[in-house]
């Protein structure tokens, strides 16, 4: 059986393992390594995840393995990598294929941008590959698909751009949810009821979005001189739409290497 090696044991690694370990353990032997991989042991025990913890000594043995990089981008060169991997799957924000290939020898490289909804196998993940090899590529993509959906984009810059739509986006949506909950409290609902109503609204909205564009949903809710259009006019006047776009732009710019420029 092939080996899938997780290098890193933080929030994203734990989210992916929680959401995908049942599928992945049928296809791979799971390994976890990093500077102090023993830190993940209580989590593995709590979630009943079968994975081998491999202490880091002088080098990480990556030979003939599928290697999933899930640590901080600036730690890429802190490790020594021994051998040639079959595939390197990188969730390192802002780290391009050149930096990856300079640091790690592999037959295949895949750059991806998952999110914390991986813990429910609901991540929306943009991916791009280098040196595509059909059989290796298929297995690497199956890893991504085990914790959500996989959207293949045309180049690595677009993977970084997807932080706007599926990376930082969940934090921005959490701010929206928190604001709506507080609005309910301000109008008289208790905190528990307000949060419950907001949660169900998000579930309903997600279902609507599967079939309809956002603009269509707005049109269905708004009536002439109605309550919703009155509220929307305030949001537009306050520049909320533009603020979201600008926030996403800032997040992408912060993450993207300085030599990344998309053609206009």
Feature map (PLM): residue ranges:
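NAD(P)+-binding Rossmann beta1-loop-alpha1 motif at the extreme N-terminus of oxidoreductases
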Residues: 1-56, 62, 66, 122-123, ...
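NAD(P)-dependent Rossmann-like dehydrogenase/reductase catalytic/cofactor-binding core
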Residues: 16, 196-264
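Short, conserved loop/helix-junction motifs that constitute active-site signature segments
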Residues: 24-25, 80-85, 102-105
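Active-site capping/gating segments
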Residues: 33, 111-129
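Internal alpha-helical scaffold of NAD(P)-dependent oxidoreductase catalytic cores
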Residues: 44, 99-109, 124-161, 172-210, ...
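Rossmann-like NAD(P)-binding element
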Residues: 56-83, 87
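ADP-ribose/adenylate-binding Rossmann-like module
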Residues: 84-96
């Amino acid at each position: 059986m092939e080996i899938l090696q997780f290098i890193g044991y933080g929030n994203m690694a734990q989210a992916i393992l929680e959401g995908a370990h049942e599928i992945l353990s049928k296809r791979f032997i799971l390994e976890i390594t990093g500077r102090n991989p023993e830190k993940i042991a209580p989590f593995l025990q709590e979630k009943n995840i079968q994975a081998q913890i491999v202490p880091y000594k002088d080098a990480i043995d990556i030979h003939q393995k599928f290697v999933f990089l899930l640590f901080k981008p600036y730690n890429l060169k802190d490790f020594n990598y021994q051998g040639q991997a079959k595939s390197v799957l990188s969730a390192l924000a802002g780290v391009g294929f050149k930096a990856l290939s300079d640091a790690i020898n592999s037959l295949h490289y895949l750059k991806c941008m998952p999110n914390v909804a991986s813990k429910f196998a609901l991540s929306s993940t943009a991916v791009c590959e280098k040196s595509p090899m059909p059989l290796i590529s298929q297995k690497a993509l199956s890893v991504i698909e085990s914790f959500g959906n996989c959207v293949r984009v045309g180049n690595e810059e677009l993977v970084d751009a997807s932080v706007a739509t599926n990376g930082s986006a969940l934090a921005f949506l959490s701010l929206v949810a928190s604001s709506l909950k507080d609005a309910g409290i301000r109008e008289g609902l208790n905190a528990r009821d307000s949060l419950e109503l907001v949660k169900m609204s998000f579930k309903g909205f997600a279902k609507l979005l599967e079939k309809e564009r956002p603009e269509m949903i707005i049109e269905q809710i708004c009536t002439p001189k109605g309550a919703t259009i009155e509220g929307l006019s305030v949001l537009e006047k306050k520049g909320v739409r533009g603020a979201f776009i600008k926030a996403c732009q800032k997040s992408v710019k912060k993450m993207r290497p300085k030599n990344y420029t998309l053609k206009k």
